[in-house]
Design a protein with these regions (language model features):
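Conserved C-terminal "lid"/linker of ANL adenylate-forming enzymes
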Residues: 87-90, 134-182
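Ser/Thr-glycine-rich phosphate-binding loops at phosphate-binding pockets of nucleotides
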Residues: 38, 63, 127, 159-161
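Conserved C-terminal helical docking segment of ANL/AMP-forming enzymes
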Residues: 67, 81-85, 110-151
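Conserved ATP-binding/catalytic segment of the ANL
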Residues: 2-63, 67-70
Length: 182
């Protein structure tokens, strides 16, 4: 558990699967005796309610040891009018793998952005959405601040269950660096 009271959710009980079929390696990673490690990061409030914060494998660990939960930040960004979806990722700044800055790819609806913010050109759209990101940054601890923005009208790469494929999206970003970046 970290300093914010967030840790991996582990469960046991009669409705929990007894293991992965013919996959001993996966069983070793996921099971600790009777306890199943879900891979979900969760927090329990004072009343005992469990809140899922994100996935363990998607956490971005900063040089100061602080954790960024992309799903938490994406939910904030996705509330911006004209934003269809977003993808938070860490961009490495030096040889130190934990020296990262938080960036976001925003998939936007051009028509809605034009109507809501009277933004027509790519630069006007960038300015309108950057202003909204700055407002969100003002509500977050400084270490969580979004430092870079990529705009796209193309949907994010997702699984058949509509979950963001984080590595594939990051690979696409690294491949196509000619995207409008601020």
């Amino acid at each position: 558990m970290n300093s914010e009271g967030i840790g991996e959710l582990v469960v046991k009980g009669p409705s929990v699967a007894i293991g992965y079929y013919n996959d001993e390696e996966a069983n070793k990673k996921a099971y600790d005796g009777e306890w199943f490690h879900t891979g979900d990061l969760a927090q329990i409030d004072e009343e005992g309610y469990i809140f899922i914060c994100g996935r363990k494998k998607s956490v971005i660990v900063l040089r100061n040891g602080k954790n960024i939960f992309p799903e938490e930040m994406e939910s904030l960004i996705n509330q911006i009018d004209g934003v269809k979806e977003s993808f938070i990722f860490g961009k490495q700044q030096s040889a130190d793998k934990n020296d990262v800055k938080i960036n976001v790819e925003i998939v936007f609806d051009r028509t809605m952005i034009n109507e809501k913010y009277q933004a027509i050109t790519d630069n006007e759209i960038y300015q309108a959405l950057s202003k909204k990101i700055k407002q969100i940054n003002g509500t977050l601890p400084r270490y969580k601040a979004i430092r870079g923005v990529i705009l796209s009208e193309q949907p994010l790469i997702k699984t058949t269950t509509n979950k963001i494929k984080r590595q594939e999206n990051l690979d696409a970003i690294n491949k196509f660096k000619n995207t409008f970046i601020g």
